[in-house]
Amino acid sequence: SHLAPFVDVSRQKLRKSVIEERIESGEVLDDAIIDKITERRLRTEVQSGIQTIQYQLITLMTCNGQAPFVTVFMYLDEVPEGRTRDDLAMIIEEVMKQRMQGVKNEKGVWITPAFPKLIYVLDEDNITEDSKYWYLTELAAKCTAKRMVPDYISAKIMKELKNGDVYPCMGCRSFLTVEDSQRNADGSHKFYGRFNQGVVTINLVDVACSAEGNMERFWEILDERLELCHRALRCRHERLLGTVSDVAPILWQNGALARLKKGETIDKLLFDGYSTISLGYAGLYEMCMRMLGKSHTDPEAKPFALAVMQRLNDKCKEWKEAENISYSVYGTPMESTTYKFAKCLQKRFGIIPGVTDKNYITNSYHVHVTEKIDAFSKLKFESEFQKLSPGGAISYIEVPNMQTNIPAVLSVLQYIYENIMYAELNTKSDFCEVCGYDGEIKIIEDETGKLVWECPNC
C-alpha cells in the first residue's frame, strides 16, 4: 500500500510525456487516446518496477549470506477507495504475475523464489464472485497452485481477534500485539516500525515426559519450565538494554524502526508495548500423547491442550503486568529446532511410541502429519488454538498439484475467510538441482530414519 500513491505520480509524468509527443508530431490531442497510451505505458512501468524489487530482494545478501526475509503485505483496504485502491490492485496483480512466472536458475529453468514472502488479505471486496476484486483472488489461487504463495489472512477473523485491526506479520508468522499505548498520529493502532525482541521456545514434550503421565506433576514442571523460559527471555531483553542507536542508523535513527538521536539508547522502545518478546511453544500433540495417550484432536484430550495454551497466555500476561514488557505466546516455526528437540528427547527419555519415536516433533498446535483429517476440519480445529497464539502462528494444509483445479483452491480460500485468521496451502513445487527434473519429488526415510528427497528421475 505504501507504493500505491506513487503509481499516480508516474501516471501524471507519463501523461505529460504523451501530450508533449503528440504536440511535437502534430497529432490530435484526444483525451481518450492520451489516457489509453498513458495507462499502457504505466502498466509497463509498474511491471518493470515490481520485477526490479523482486530481483533486488533475492540477490541482496545479509551478513550471514542469506536473502533477507521480507514480507510483502497485499491488503486493498489499507488505501482509500477510488483510483489509489485501483492502483494498489494493479500492483498486487503484477506482484502475483511476477511470482507465477518465477525466476530462472542457472539451468535456465523458471523456479519458485523463496522471497519475498507474499501475504494476501481476504476481505469483503475480493472473496465472492460478484465482488470488485475477485479477479485478484482468482489470480492468487492460481499463484498458490503453482508457487505455494501467497499466504492468506482473513480480515474478518483478524478483526475479531485483533480489536478491529488488520496488519501483517513479521517474517513468516510473528505478529505484534495490539497495544493501546502505541498509536499513529491519526489515533489508529501503530504496527509499522514496531519490532520483536526475540523468542525462547518451551519444549512441551519434555515437560510431559518429565512428568511421566502424572497430571499434578505436569503442572508443577510446566510452571518451573515457564519460569526458566522467562529468565531466558529476560536475558534477551537485558542484552538489548543500553544499545545505542548508532549501531544501526537505518533502523534506529532514519525511521525503519524509530527516529532516535545519535548516541540515544533504544531502551524506551523495549517497554510499553512498542516491541514484543515471544514465548514460543512446540509439541502440543506429543504432549497430549504422553499425558493422555490421545491426540489433541480427540475430544477427551482437547480441553487439556487448550488449558496448557491458556496457562502460557496467563504467564505472559502476569510477566507483562509486572515488567511493562509485551510478552506474547508464539507458535514457533521450529525448522531445524524440531530435529534438535527430537534428538534431545530420545537421549533423555528413549523411544516412546507416538511421542519420541520420530526425528521431529510437531510444530506448535498443528495436527500431526500422520492423522487422517480433511483440509476443512484441520483448519476449523486449529483455528481454536490460533486464537491462543497472539504472538503469531500459521496453519497449513497439504494439497496435491492443484493447477488444474483452481475452483477447489478458491473454495479453500473462502473457507479460510470464514473460519481462521492466517493459513497457507502447501502444494508441490519441486525442482531437482541434480538432473533438472521439474515435478513432484517424493520424501522418503533413509536407513537412519531421516526424511530425505528422492527424485523419480535420477
Regions found by a protein language model. Name each.
Residues S1-G273, K294, D298-C458:
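Conserved catalytic cores of very large enzyme subunits
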Residues I277-R290, Q310:
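Contiguous, well-ordered alpha-helical segments that form the cores/surfaces of helical PPI scaffolds
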